[in-house]
């Protein structure tokens, strides 16, 4: 089985020794997306809803670079700084996964890169 490294300028560049995504075995494995503006590489300021929106936009950009959509996502993992924000995160998340939502885990963590409030990781089925 071979693997293909995926990179797009429409999503933030990796801030460490990892790829934006890797395609292997018929799946696209997306690294965690945080709310960075892809052009400036700065954290999008504001509330958890604003940061969730940007993280999901970044995820969508990586998917679209491979001809995929959120409909192709089979699993997501959300990392949030405060579980009290769960409802706010869900409200934004539901706009991206309105029907046939993927399997999902949501974990509260002590700290995320660049002290953001949310990170989104995904696995998508390639066409």
Whereabouts are the PLM-identified features?
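Short, polar/acidic, helix-capping and beta-turn segments at strand->helix junctions
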Residues: 2-127
């Amino acid at each position: 089985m071979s693997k293909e490294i995926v990179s797009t300028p429409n999503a933030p560049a990796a801030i460490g020794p990892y790829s934006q995504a890797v395609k292997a075995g018929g799946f696209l494995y997306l690294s965690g997306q945080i709310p960075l503006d892809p052009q400036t590489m700065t954290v999008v300021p504001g509330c958890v809803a604003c940061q969730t929106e940007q993280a999901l936009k970044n995820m969508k950009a990586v998917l679209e670079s491979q001809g995929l959509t959120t409909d192709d996502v089979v699993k997501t993992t959300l990392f949030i700084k405060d579980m009290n924000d769960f409802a706010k995160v869900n409200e934004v998340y539901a706009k991206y996964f309105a029907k046939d939502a993927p399997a999902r885990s949501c974990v509260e963590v002590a700290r995320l890169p660049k002290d953001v409030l949310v990170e989104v990781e995904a696995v998508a089925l390639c066409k």
